[in-house]
Design a protein with these regions (language model features):
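Polytopic transmembrane helical bundles with strong interfacial aromatic enrichment
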Residues: 1-205
């Protein structure tokens, strides 16, 4: 388990990245709505260009940081990764939200490219522009759900957690397994993000 100072640092990092992610998504949603509904051509163009930069330089880094620091928090504190239902549910929400975010960066780039090429009329790229609003709303609800789980911590302990509560001393193999899980998750995520940045980053589509 992590020491007190390390645990507080990890918690601070996790909360900061999670709050930053939520705030960036809220800003993204405001820009998406403005870009969809405004008739001011310069404003629409600026909104979609800003959305692409917010995505790659704020939302993506904060989402990855939130997921990784969440794993560190789970594996390095008594909460554990599989001991409480709320931890598992929050992890699932975060993983799904991060994966969907990375997959749906292509429409953002497509609309930003369209804005660069010239003024966007009301009907131009409308399906993609509507998708950006819908994606942002879904992401906002997912992050609010994750925040709610962190605050209320519902549903109690899993069967695995109850067994560990009775016999809290971990076997060496259990320690090796949890550390291996963390390293594998980190490696897979880093490789996926690196591949996506290379193949579908800013104007890479």
């Amino acid at each position: 388990m992590m020491g007190s100072a390390v645990r507080k640092f990890a918690l601070t990092t996790h909360v900061t990245s999670s709050v930053g992610w939520l705030g960036a998504v809220a800003a993204f949603l405001a820009l998406a709505i403005g870009g969809l509904t405004s008739t001011d051509v310069p404003l629409v163009r600026a909104a979609y260009l800003a959305m692409e930069f917010i995505t790659w330089f704020v939302i993506v880094p904060f989402s990855v940081a939130s997921l990784l620091t969440g794993l560190v928090q789970a594996l390095g504190t008594p909460w554990g990764l599989f001991r409480h239902y709320w931890v598992m549910a929050k992890l699932a929400v975060t993983v799904v939200a991060t994966a969907i975010l990375l997959v749906h960066t292509q429409p953002i780039g497509a609309v930003a490219d369209g804005a660069l090429q010239g003024p966007l009329a009301a009907g131009d790229l409308r399906p993609l522009r509507l998708q950006l609003v819908a994606d942002a709303v879904a992401a906002l609800f997912a992050l609010l759900a994750a925040t709610t789980l962190s605050v209320y911590k519902p549903w109690g302990m899993t069967a695995y957690g109850q067994r560990e509560a009775v016999a809290p001393v971990r076997a060496p193999m259990s320690i090796i397994w949890t550390r291996s899980m963390l390293l594998i998750a980190l490696g897979v995520l880093i490789l996926f993000v690196a591949w996506h940045l290379v193949s579908g980053g800013l104007h890479g589509h």
